[in-house]
A protein has these predicted regions:
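Acidic, proline/glycine-enriched N-terminal capping motif
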Residues: 1-57, 61-68
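Short, conserved charged micro-motifs
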Residues: 34-39, 89-93, 122-125, 150-156, ...
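Short amphipathic beta-strand starts and helix->beta connectors
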Residues: 6-15, 58-70, 100-101, 125-134, ...
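Residue-level signal for inorganic ion chemistry
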Residues: 32, 82, 120, 206, ...
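Acidic, low-complexity central loop/insert segments
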Residues: 18-20, 26-27, 69-175
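Glycine-rich, small/acidic residue-mixed loop/short-helix segments
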Residues: 71, 168, 185, 191-197, ...
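A common structural junction motif
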Residues: 46-47, 97-106, 154-164, 243-248, ...
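Catalytic strand-loop segment that frames the active site of acyl-thioester-processing enzymes
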Residues: 7, 13-22, 166-192
Length: 298
C-alpha cells in the first residue's frame, strides 16, 4: 500500500477508529478451585476489579520488581485466560509453574485464536457493534476483540494495514514487548504504573520494590515520544544525543506518520534530560533535530 493510502487510513483511524487482525499471541488458561487466590498473589492488579466481558492489563514481576511478563487477564467461565507476547511462552509458563505449591491450579497452553480488534466508533457503531466480544484497550482507546472464522462478517471489514497500527501505537507512546519492554525493565520506566498496577492491594512478587519507587517518585529513565521532521535516517537502536554530544537515550521504535511525513520515535531518556536533542543520520552524516512531544506518554 502506498503512503498516500496509508495516510488516509491513519487519519480515519484517529477520528473513527478501525479494525485490525491481532498477530499471534500467547494464551494461557488457569483453572482449578485455587486459581483466583493463586493468580491474585502473582499479578500487579486487584483481580476483584475484573469485570465479566472485560480484560484487565497487569504485569508479572520478578522479586526485584523487574518485568517478567505484561498481561491481559479475563474470565472465561470459572477459568482465567492470560494473554502475553508469544516470545516469552517458555519463560512465562515456567514462572507460573514455579509458584504453585499445593494449589489446585491447572495451567494449560491454549491454541492460537484468530481475533480481530476493533476500536473507536467502529467498535461500537455500524456492522461490527452487534457482535459479542471482549472489551479491551489495545491502542489506548476503548475497543473490542472478536474471534473470527471463515465466512464471519468481520472478515468482510476493511482491516488496517499493520504499518498504520504500528504508527498509532507509537504516537500514543504504547510500549511493546521486544521493543520497549523486556526483562530488565522496571514498569514505571515505561509508564506501566499508570495502566498495569494497583497500589492499594496486597503483596505479590516485586511489590515492595514497586511501592518504594512510588514513594520516591522517580526512576532513572522514562519513555518519551520524540518527533523529527520528514525524512529518513532514524531507526531503532539509534542513539539520541544532547547538545553537548552525550548520549541521553536510545530509540526503541520508529514510525513515519504517513499523513504528515513526520517521523516519530519512542525512546527511553535519562531523567532530567531536556531539549535540544538530535541524532545523526548514519547514511548522510547529517544531524536530525528531535523534539519531545507534548503527547509523550510518561
Amino acid at each position: 500500500m502506498d503512503e498516500e493510502k496509508l495516510g488516509e487510513q491513519l487519519r480515519l483511524a484517529r477520528s473513527e477508529g478501525g479494525c485490525f487482525l491481532l498477530p499471534r499471541r500467547l494464551l494461557i488458561r488457569l483453572s482449578g478451585t485455587d486459581a483466583f487466590r493463586y493468580l491474585h498473589g502473582q499479578v500487579t492488579r486487584d483481580l476483584t476489579r475484573l469485570v465479566p466481558g472485560e480484560a484487565l492489563a497487569a504485569c508479572i514481576l520478578t522479586p526485584k520488581g523487574k518485568l517478567a511478563a505484561p498481561l491481559l487477564i479475563w474470565r472465561e467461565g470459572e477459568d482465567f485466560l492470560l494473554e502475553s507476547a508469544s516470545e516469552i511462552e517458555e519463560a512465562l509458563l515456567a514462572r507460573l509453574e514455579r509458584y504453585i505449591v499445593a494449589d489446585d491450579v491447572s495451567i494449560t497452553l491454549e491454541k492460537p485464536r484468530q481475533v480481530v480488534h476493533c476500536f473507536g466508533k467502529v467498535a461500537f457503531e455500524g456492522s461490527t457493534s452487534n457482535q459479542a466480544g471482549l472489551h479491551v484497550s489495545r491502542l489506548g482507546m476503548p475497543g473490542v476483540d472478536r474471534e473470527v472464522g471463515e465466512g464471519d462478517s468481520l472478515c468482510q471489514v476493511s482491516l488496517l494495514d499493520p504499518a498504520v497500527v504500528e504508527a498509532l501505537r507509537i504516537e500514543r507512546s504504547l510500549p511493546a514487548w521486544g521493543s520497549e519492554l523486556n526483562g530488565e525493565l522496571l514498569p514505571p520506566e515505561a509508564g506501566l504504573d499508570l495502566t498495569h498496577i494497583d497500589y492499594d492491594r496486597g503483596c505479590y512478587p516485586g511489590q515492595e520494590i514497586i511501592s518504594r519507587i512510588k514513594s520516591v517518585g522517580k526512576v532513572n529513565r522514562n519513555l518519551h515520544l520524540l518527533v523529527a521532521a520528514p525524512g529518513g535516517g532514524l531507526h531503532p537502536g539509534q542513539a539520541v544525543l544532547s547538545a553537548d554530544g552525550t548520549e541521553s537515550g536510545v530509540m526503541t521504535s520508529v514510525s513515519t506518520q504517513f499523513d504528515t511525513g513526520s517521523v516519530l520515535a519512542l525512546c527511553f531518556l535519562k531523567r532530567g534530560v531536556e531539549e535540544p536533542l538530535f541524532a545523526f543520520d548514519p547514511l548522510t552524516g547529517l544531524k536530525r533535530d528531535l523534539t519531545i512531544s507534548r503527547n509523550s506518554g510518561t
